[in-house]
Amino acid sequence: MRAIFLFLFTSVFLAAAEATQFPSINLSLSAPTSPQDLVSSLNVLVVLTLLVLAPSLILVMTSFVRLIVVFSFLRQALGTQQQPPNQLLVSLAMVLTFFIMEPVATKSYDNAIKPYLDKKIGYEEAFEKGVAPFKKFMIRNTREKDLALFFRIRDLKNPQNPEAVPLIVAIPAFIISELKSAFEIGFLLYLPFLIIDMVVSSVLMSMGMMMLPPVMISMPFKLLIFVLVDGWNLLVGNLIMSFK
């Protein structure tokens, strides 16, 4: 039966391939014949480099950093080892990032990508207008102390308005601000579960069960309490509302 299925699938695929006229692609390398050709080649190289780095840059310029760190702290506080798995936590953080950043991304698309595709602006202007909403989001969620740190390191004057903050300063300041916020939330998450661990450990010691790991006994109580208080609803809701 499997062989018949593979045969039919292959036959249909080959028939469709023969019926479809694919355009011919010719790749060739040649030396630039004019300065304009060299500039165009360099522009293509820069664009390809940005495309490779874009996913990492977008992640550190959005709410993803705070979300994934907090979810990691939650799993450690619950003591559930690999549950939820890393892939699920990353997927949840990505989905919530899309939800939080949707207004910013829409504004970036309307101001930069759409006019660029319509050939109304150049790629340099499109880059500036496309990054502007993300930079505004980062500055709103960045502590002034962190911004001042990188201005002092680069020996730059303090800007008169948020729009004048360079992107090279806004990104690292935003990252360390997000890490600090995530660690503060992680500390608050740890406290109730730490109390449960201490209570269970004290009860086991009073009963003379010193060889029994307290984590094994406390984990079901942690999960029960987390479910009873609707922990995911509280955590995700407060995380989303924590962004300005």
What is each stretch, according to the model?
Residues 1-18:
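N-terminal secretory/membrane targeting signals
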Residues 17-244:
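Hydrophobic alpha-helical segments and their helix-loop boundaries in membrane
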